UniProtKB/Swiss-Prot annotation:
Family that this chain belongs to: Belongs to the PlsX family.
Pathway: Lipid metabolism; phospholipid metabolism
Organism field: Pseudomonas putida (strain GB-1)
InterPro entries the UniProt entry points to: FA_synthesis, Phospholipid_synth_PlsX-like
This protein's UniProt keywords: Cytoplasm, Lipid biosynthesis, Lipid metabolism, Phospholipid biosynthesis, Phospholipid metabolism, Transferase
Protein's recorded name: Phosphate acyltransferase
EC top class named in words: transferase
GO molecular function, one term: phosphate:acyl-[acyl carrier protein] acyltransferase activity
Enzyme Commission (EC) number: 2.3.1.274
Length: 336
């Protein structure tokens, strides 16, 4: 297998580089074809990788960056005021062909602005969209947009549907069912932009558009790709993650009661732990910026080691599936 090279913004996120480097080391050990470039403060990063086995260290490079983009900085400030930030340099490595993907846990707005500036969008795409896998009764669906575009036109939603369908196919879904997230399934429901997007999708060639889906239908697995604006999508994503965490915590509390509760817990806990692990936000961490001329994966800023590993794994899949090129090849046929 040919090598996969990923640039890591090692200074992004809420907790600094330690968990990012630990996740990177774990991925290197698990994937012999993986090469990583950590971008950030060299002295700090060298200390964190000092115990790495020689074979793995040979597949890890450190590139210096003198600036870090804060989680609360305005995208315009990051774009104009920090040309030597770890985030920007990681993206430039992708642009220059020195890496095949960039993974960052940094400021979402800054990452989107820099990605559009450094990598540019694919021809025909007005705005990139953030997409991630959401667990459902039937497996997973791809949900987009997750916050990159708070206000969207009908044409934006149409483009998101096209990109989401191609991404789902790249992940192994044959003829993915595409739906618009709405407050009802009837044609009269929804705001003007959603209704207009529905009319565009109904006439689209090569898309398996199945209509509107409500929030409960999403979790029942009624669609493989669910499209909404970034305001709705971000709220849905974070509510889902919070609910999954709360359910796991409540289950553990219930089985810590009396003798009968503990006995029942001893029997049921292995299965419940499997369910909890399947729904855990860390397992599904890593949102892809679709529509760029390069692969960019956004990790949660609060992600720990397991979560950041998941983001790197998503980047690996998109490299292996050559996702930007596949998107480019399909867009000419599907876009308006």
């Amino acid at each position: 297998m040919s090598a996969q090279i990923i640039a890591i913004d090692a200074m992004g996120g809420d907790f600094g580089p330690r968990s990012i480097v630990q996740a990177s080391i774990a991925c290197l050990s698990a994937t012999p074809s993986l090469h990583l470039t950590l971008v950030g403060q060299p002295s700090l990063l060298e200390d964190l990788v000092s115990g790495l086995a020689a074979a793995d260290r040979a597949r890890l490079q450190i590139v210096a960056a003198s600036e870090v983009i804060g989680m609360d900085e305005r995208p315009s400030q990051a774009l104009r005021g920090k040309p030597d930030s770890s985030m920007r340099i990681a993206l430039e490595l992708v642009r220059d062909g020195k890496a095949q993907a960039c993974v960052s846990a940094g400021n979402t707005g800054a990452l989107m602005a820099l990605s559009r500036f450094v990598l540019k969008t694919l021809p025909g795409i007005d705005r990139p969209a953030m997409v991630a896998a959401i667990p459902t009764q039937a497996g997973y669906c791809q949900l987009l947009d997750l916050g990159a575009n708070v206000d969207c036109s009908a044409e934006n939603l149409y483009q998101f549907a096209v990109m989401g369908s191609v991404a789902a196919q790249a992940l192994g879904v044959h003829r993915p069912r595409v739906a618009l997230l709405n407050i009802g399934t009837e044609d009269i429901k929804g705001n003007q932009q959603v209704k207009l997007a529905a009319s565009l999708l109904q006439n689209a060639r090569g898309l398996n558009y199945v209509g509107f889906v409500e929030g409960d239908g999403l979790y029942r697995g009624e669609a493989d790709v669910v499209v909404c604006d970034g305001f709705v999508g971000n709220i849905l994503l974070k509510s889902s993650e919070g609910l999954a965490t709360m359910i796991g915590a409540r289950i553990e509390q219930l089985f810590k009661g009396g003798v009968l509760s503990r006995a029942a817990g001893a029997v049921a806990m292995p299965l419940l732990k499997r369910l909890q692990a399947d729904l855990a936000p860390a397992r599904h961490n890593g949102a892809s910026f679709l529509g760029l001329q390069g692969i960019v994966i956004k990790s949660h800023g609060s992600a720990g080691v397991q979560g950041f590993q998941s983001a790197i794994q998503r980047a690996l899949i998109e490299i292996q599936e050559n996702l930007p090129q596949r998107l480019h090849g399909r867009l000419e046929d599907l876009l308006l």
